[in-house]
Structure formats: C-alpha cells, structure tokens
C-alpha cells in the first residue's frame, strides 16, 4: 500500500469534547470537498462527558440531562463516557484510499486496539455480535464511528486508568450488565503517555502513515 500523509495532534492537556469535535469536522469537510487530501489523527483525553450516537436509546442514560455534559453526535453506537485517564483516538480518514467497507474499518480498529493491549501484555479479544474489545468479560475499549462520503469521523477509546464509576451512570454501549475495565487493572503504575506512544506507532503501521504536524 502507498504511504499516506496524516496530520497528528497529541495534546497533553485535557481537551473539551466540543473543541475537538469541531476540529474533526473541519478536517472531514476539507477531505470531502477536495480542499485537502491529508488525513487527520487526534490522540488525547477529554473532560468528563457522555456522548450518544444516532438512534441511541435515551433510557441508557441513568441520570437527568441537566446533571452532566451530554452530546448527541453523528456516530453509530450507543451511549459512552469520556473522562481523564481514558485515551481517545479520533481518525478522520478518506476510505477511498484504503477500503470502502465499514465492516473492514471496524475490524481494523479492533485489531489496532488488541495489538496495543498486547504490547502491554494484556490479553484481549472481540465478542461475536458486538463492536469493541474485552479483557475476559469486561469491556476495556469502545468504538464509535461516523462516515460521510467515505470520510470517517470519531474513533475509539481505551480505558487506561480512569474512574470506572463514571460508567455506572449509563448502560455502556447499550449492553445490559456490561462491566468495564482499565489497563491499569492488569499493569500497575501505567502512564497514559506510554499508551499514546504505542497507539500512534500501531496506527502508523496499520495504515502506512507518514505523520506530520500542522
């Protein structure tokens, strides 16, 4: 496969969900309109918030909407939670240059997550009928994507050392009884910066990217 160029942003500070969403849309619109042919990757952490996908069941929010920041966004999937200690990765990719197949793309993301976890000697797997990655019976990574004219938006999150009790306020991904896990449950004293380095490396390998800064 021919190497692709992608802009990458990796802020150290905790980022507002709204600000990063606007950034994704800017790059998605540029790819769709033909103003740019450069993909965009963002790796970082968000302030505590909840997001719900298209057609989500509002009954999976177990709190009043005025209690927390909730964003209804243009991705598939149900409700999930973002917070410090969770590494979020957004990929704005033109699938014309890879494979115009969303099932292929979702399986590719799962493969990336499993390889990341394996790099830290954490065994993980997928589950038939579900999207995401599990360690045993607990979910450690969630995936939610949007796609317009074969240009993707949103991506995946891996729980590194976040406050898992924040998931108690929702039915995670619409899965009743779903229990969540952190990477730090299996590898103590884990720094999210270490995970960020590996995620970047594996994305680069899997998509044949040449990364540049804007």
From Swiss-Prot:
Residues under site feature: Lowers pKa of active site Cys: 139
Superkingdom, taxonomy of origin: Bacteria
Domain BPL/LPL catalytic: 35-211
Pathway listed: Protein modification; protein lipoylation via endogenous pathway; protein N(6)-(lipoyl)lysine from octanoyl-[acyl-carrier-protein]: step 1/2
Binding-site residues, substrate: 75-82, 142-144, 155-157
Residues of the active site: 173
Localization, UniProt: Cytoplasm
GO cellular component, one term: cytoplasm
Stated family: Belongs to the LipB family.
Other observations noted: In the reaction, the free carboxyl group of octanoic acid is attached via an amide linkage to the epsilon-amino group of a specific lysine residue of lipoyl domains of lipoate-dependent enzymes.
Name of the protein described by the UniProt record: Octanoyltransferase
Encoding gene per record: lipB
């Amino acid at each position: 496969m021919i190497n692709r160029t992608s802009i990458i942003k990796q802020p150290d500070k905790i980022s507002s969900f709204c600000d990063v969403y606007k950034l994704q849309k800017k790059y998605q619109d540029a790819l769709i309109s033909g103003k740019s042919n450069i993909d965009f990757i963002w790796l970082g952490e968000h302030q505590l918030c909840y997001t719900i996908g298209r057609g989500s069941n509002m009954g999976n929010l177990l709190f009043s909407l005025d209690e927390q920041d909730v964003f209804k966004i243009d991705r598939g999937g149900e409700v999930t939670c973002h917070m410090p200690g969770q590494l979020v990765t957004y990929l704005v990719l033109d699938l014309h240059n890879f494979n115009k197949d969303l099932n292929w793309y979702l399986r590719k993301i799962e493969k990336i997550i499993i390889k990341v976890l394996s790099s830290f000697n954490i065994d993980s797997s997928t589950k038939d009928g579900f999207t995401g990655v599990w360690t045993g019976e607990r979910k450690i990574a969630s995936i939610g994507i949007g796609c317009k004219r074969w240009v993707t938006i949103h991506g995946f999150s891996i729980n590194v050392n976040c406050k898992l009790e924040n998931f108690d306020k929702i039915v995670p991904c619409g899965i009743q009884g779903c229990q969540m896990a952190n990477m730090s449950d299996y590898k103590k004293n884990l720094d999210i910066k270490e995970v960020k380095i590996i995620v970047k490396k594996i994305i680069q390998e899997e998509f044949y990217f040449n990364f540049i800064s804007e």
